[in-house]
Every structure is written in C-alpha cells, then in structure tokens.
Amino acid sequence: MSAGAITIGLDFGSDSVRALAVDCQSGQELETEVVYYPRWREGKYCQPANNQFRHHPLDYIESLEQAIKVVVSRLTNEQRQHIIGIGVDSTGSTPAPIDEHGQILALRPEFADNPNAMFVLWKDHTAIEEAEAINTLCRSGQFPDYTRYIGGVYSSEWFWAKILHVSREDAAVRQAAVSWIELCDWVPALLSGTQAPADIRRGRCSAGHKSLWHPSWGGLPPKDFLHALDPCLTETLQYPLFTDTWTAEQPVGTITAEWAQRLGIPETVILAGGAFDCHVGTVGAGAQPYTLVKVIGTSTCDILIADDARIADRTIAGICGQVDGSVIPGYIGLEAGQSAFGDMYAWFGRLLGWSLQEAAKDYAEQGHPELKTSLQAMEAKLLERLTRCWAENPTLDHLPVVLDWFNGRRTPFANQRLKGVITDLNLGTDAPTLFGGFIAATAFGARAIMECFEDQGVPVENVLALGGIARKSPVIMQVCTDVMNRPLQIVASDQCCALGAAIFAAVAAGVHCDIPTAQQHMASGIERTLMPDSQRVARYQQLYARYQQWCRLAEPAYSPTSTAKN
C-alpha cells in the first residue's frame, strides 16, 4: 500500500456537493468542504407544484471545482502530491441528454435555459404516465418482463421514464440528443476528458437499478421493446445507449491536464467509476452482508447486500432492484427507500413558518430589520423546538396517523401517484403532537421496507443509520428503533457517501486490492447503538397496524382510473 496516499470522494447531493479528502491507510478524514448549487438555491428550473426538479450542469461543474479547490488548499504541499484518486457518487436516477460530443445539451447556448436539456433530478415526478406505460408494456405479454429484477414496478424517478417524458415533451431536445447519461457516470467522464458517448463507461449500479440493464437479456432491453414503447426512443438516440457496465472500484481514466491544473492536484490522479450515493454510502459505513443500511436525508435509500447463493434465481418484489456488484463486487445489491423523510419534516416546518415569514416581510417594510432577523432565527429553530416539545411529552394515545407519501412511495412497490394523508385529527391536536405523527410515519415507512425484505426470505440481521438526521436527531432515531423493534446502530461519520467514494477511489488507484480490504482501513465506525423500549414497542405496533389499514384504504383513491381528485 502507498504510504501517505490520499483519495478524494465527491458526493453530489440534492442541494450541494461535498468533497472529502481521506488518508487511505488510517481512514482519517483530513479535510472536507460543502458547496451549494447556486442556481438550485435560487429555485431556478424547478416547478415544485408540477413535481419538476432540474439541475443545471453548471451547478455541478462550478460547485465541484470550488469544493475540491478549498479541500486541496487546506492540505499541506506534501499531502497534495499524495492525492492519487477521485471517486464519485450522486443522487439517482438523475440523467441528462448529451450530444455526439458527450456534452450536456444545457451547456450549449441554444439550450442554456431549457430545463429539459438539464439533469432531471431523482425526485422529479413529471414522468408518472411514462412509467406507467413502461409497466403496462412489460406486463403485456408481448415481451419478457424487463422489470423483474427491479422489483416488478418501474418508477417515474428512473432513467427510461424520464427520457421518454422529455422526448415526448420537447422536440428540440429529442432531435439534438444522441444519448442520455446519469450524473454519477458523467462526472468521471468530464474529469477524464471522455467525450464520445460510446466511450463513456456506464456504472453497474445505475444501469442495473434504474436502466433495466441485466446480463440475462444482453444488457438493455431490445430495440423493438423501446420502439413499441414509443418510436421517439429509437429515432435519434443511439442504440444501444450502452452495452457493458463497470463496477465502481474499476478505474475509468486519468484526470486531464486541464482539470488537474484547475483543481491543483497531480496529473496522475485516477478516476474511479461512478455509483449512486446510497450504495457508496453503504460501503463508507462498513456494512456487511444482511445489514440493512438506511441512508437518511431528504429521502431515504435502504441498501442490503446478499450473497448470490441465498438469492439464487429468486426475484425480490416491490424493491428498487437487485444487481450483482452494485455495492460490492461479488454480492447482490438490494435497494429500497422512502421518497420523503427529511422533506416531510421540512414541508411541515414551512407550513408552520409561513406566518413568521409574512411577519418578517412586514417588519422589514416598516424599517425594523432587527425584528425580521429575530423571526428568521425563530423559523430556523422551529423543527428543533417541535421535536424537543414532543419528546418532553411523547404521548401516543392521540397521535395522528400520517401516511408518508408526500412525495409518492418508492418502497414497497413504487407508486408516485400517491399523496400524503393525515388522519385522526381532533380539536386537541397541537403542532408538536402532529409533528410526532410525522416522525412516526417516517418510522412506519422504514419498517414496511424491512418487512418487504424479510417477508420474502431475505434476513435483516442488523440495521445501520447514517446521515445528518441519524446523527443529530436521537428522538427521531429512537422512534425508528421502537417501531422497527430492532437495535439501531448510528454510524459515526456524517459524510459516509463521500467516504465511500474515497474508498472506491483507493481501490481504483491500486492502494487496496478490493473493497472489503479498503473498508478495514477506511470505513467509518459506529457512534452509538439505540435499543428498543419494550413499552413503546407495543403501542407503536398498534399504531403501525392502523397505518397499514389506512394505506390499504387510501391507495385505491390515487389509481389512474379513480374519480378522486389527485
């Protein structure tokens, strides 16, 4: 192993990018920097009411450059010379259209302000009808069921649904695009100077979980399937978009001289393959087989790795894919998740904070900026106070039952038509109690995922949680522990995704021979373990049964044939 070797992990989240420099031998996290996407912060190119969320590629380019340069500037001269690799993870499915030169269309002047020419963020749900069309065709009997290895349901959050939606909606983008690319694959291609779409290495993780790629049918679905779905998918797009895939520990190239100079790092830096944030975060957390890893943020992604012998030829229904090598080579990566977790809390905070925002505007107009500042400070602490107030008197006797479908449902059985539901309100329901219902709802969603695995013979032997909410909100995590009735281990690092990316870079650069070996040196430890409270477990079991009852009652109201207002 190279003494003093350092790798950098890049973690592209929904709001920001994080760069993390890690010592490959000790696992010490040397320096980190977070940079928020400027256009995204201004709300550009997004229409939340229409479920449209887009990222301009310049947000990624500018932010990654700033983040890495800050991290590098804090290292010593000697440390800078020991930077040997960069690993990348991102949200997903977050694809964008590219031209014959591998350029994102939004980087061309004629598409600079066209949201359809940008990255379609994972939580963009504009492609619900297209996802349903994919599911219908897969179940028609005309073709094999190409959804069988991704849980049996294709989601509007995923690759082909988004391509189909944009292609149908925007003729200019449809004519200009020759291929589409996931964010986690584009960044390594950008930094390594790989331009021709056919030369860009596509990650096993994104391809297997979101693009209907599987070796049993030779890669992507055949051209006649895509043509039957819509001829627009075969008119101008290259076919196949790609055939081969690579696991993320494999090198995809060396950084270009231009990028090395811009970032202040050696020209010998190796780029590892890209993968989705939660799969990479699972590696950063040091997870072992049959450990359910909950990566908790605005949403959750739940990852479990299993050996091929136990899964064999079985397909696990209702999840977001089972892919050989999507997490660690040699193991099947199983993915699930909740479409909203922290986003639900944030929505409730915005709802209650509206009056504070309006009052702040009034005070500013009246020449009292100090009062505006005070109100803004109150709003910033609103969720913290709600959590504390509910924790001081966490009565479960009159807890509202909330369905955690505020951004649709990812698992079990993806359905993005679903909406959030709040039940069991009365005139005595106050804000902290209702917020307690929101906390319980996210925990109920977590339990439903665990049961989806266990009910199909996939054991969950351990549960880990990582991310900002996991580390900073013991109240919420204790509710999850009680609802799941399992010990819950909290991972020490709050940047496991970037850490996992650095681990993949260490293997790609040849510092470690494989991912398990690299994990022994670099993965995070456990900060603390929460244990279930037996009395609260029993009460939550009753509430969970009511949650399930409401799920069964509410879901039919959001079917496409329902007369209910969506």
Swiss-Prot record:
Q: Name the reaction it catalyses.
A: D-ribulose + ATP = D-ribulose 5-phosphate + ADP + H(+); L-ribulose + ATP = L-ribulose 5-phosphate + ADP + H(+)
Give a GO biological-process term: L-arabinose catabolic process to xylulose 5-phosphate
Which EC number(s) does the record attach to this protein? 2.7.1.16
Which keywords annotate this record? Answer: Arabinose catabolism, ATP-binding, Carbohydrate metabolism, Kinase, Nucleotide-binding, Transferase
Enumerate the GO terms in the molecular function aspect: ATP binding; D-ribulokinase activity; ribulokinase activity
Q: Which Gene3D superfamilies match?
A: 1.20.58.2240, 3.30.420.40
Coiled-coil residues are none
A single GO CC term for this protein reads:
cytoplasm
NCBIfam families under this entry? L-ribulokinase, PRK04123.1
User: Which protein family is named in the record?
Assistant: Belongs to the ribulokinase family.
Q: What is this protein called?
A: Ribulokinase
